């Protein structure tokens, strides 16, 4: 188990180092866009009618401002990745936070306003999945297709702020994107046969293939 964890850690470091090599000598990463489920959600579910909320204790007990909607006691994966990149860049450039372009946590789509969207937006939503119906028994959620639509709306707002689509595209082409989703398509869909029909319609192999195909199409839309 330890060897497996070490392998994952080494792989993660290599990926990040490869990212650093790619951006070395280039302009700073200006923005950070986050898509996913509760592992990355930082407050988008707070005002939704859903059981999947984390804006109350003991969530956030180790976060500076208390509960924020993150499904953790402190920072979530998206926050940690941003901070890890900050540390790596600091070792190399000594002014990494300025290089990355992030001077604060990325705001959730639900509360992102004005020019702060230019540094990035977090669209993740607890209980969300690749499939639109996933997690519906828990209440409202922002499934991946809707997160992508929200990103499209953000881009339109960016065009208004920047002044034209060409400049906006140039800005977006240097941004960092992270997507973490799919577990709810099992634990809050396929493995809940009393609520969802996917378990009776597809074998495990067929369902996995279906998810991969739909996810691939969604990534193409994002790109």
Which role does the model predict for each range below?
Residues 2-223:
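Conserved active-site regions of diverse hydrolases
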């Amino acid at each position: 188990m330890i060897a497996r964890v070490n392998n994952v850690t080494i792989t993660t470091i290599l990926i990040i180092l490869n990212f650093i090599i790619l951006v070395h000598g280039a302009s700073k990463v200006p923005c950070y866009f986050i898509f996913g489920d509760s592992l990355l959600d930082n407050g988008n579910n707070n005002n939704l009618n859903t059981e999947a909320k984390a804006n109350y204790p003991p969530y956030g007990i180790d976060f500076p401002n208390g509960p924020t909607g993150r499904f953790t006691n402190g920072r979530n994966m998206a926050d940690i990745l941003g901070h890890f990149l900050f540390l790596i860049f600091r070792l190399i450039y000594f002014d990494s936070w300025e290089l990355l372009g992030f001077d604060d946590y990325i705001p959730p789509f639900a509360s992102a306003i004005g020019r702060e969207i230019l540094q990035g937006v977090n669209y993740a939503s607890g209980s969300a999945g690749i499939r639109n119906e996933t997690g519906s028994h828990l209440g409202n959620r922002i499934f991946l297709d809707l997160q992508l639509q929200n990103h499209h709306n953000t881009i339109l707002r960016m065009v208004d702020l920047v002044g034209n689509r060409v400049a906006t595209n140039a800005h977006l082409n240097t941004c960092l994107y992270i997507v973490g989703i799919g577990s709810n398509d099992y634990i809050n869909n396929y493995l809940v046969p009393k609520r969802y029909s996917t378990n009776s319609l597809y074998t495990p192999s067929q369902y996995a293939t279906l998810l991969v195909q739909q996810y691939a199409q969604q990534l193409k839309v994002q790109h």
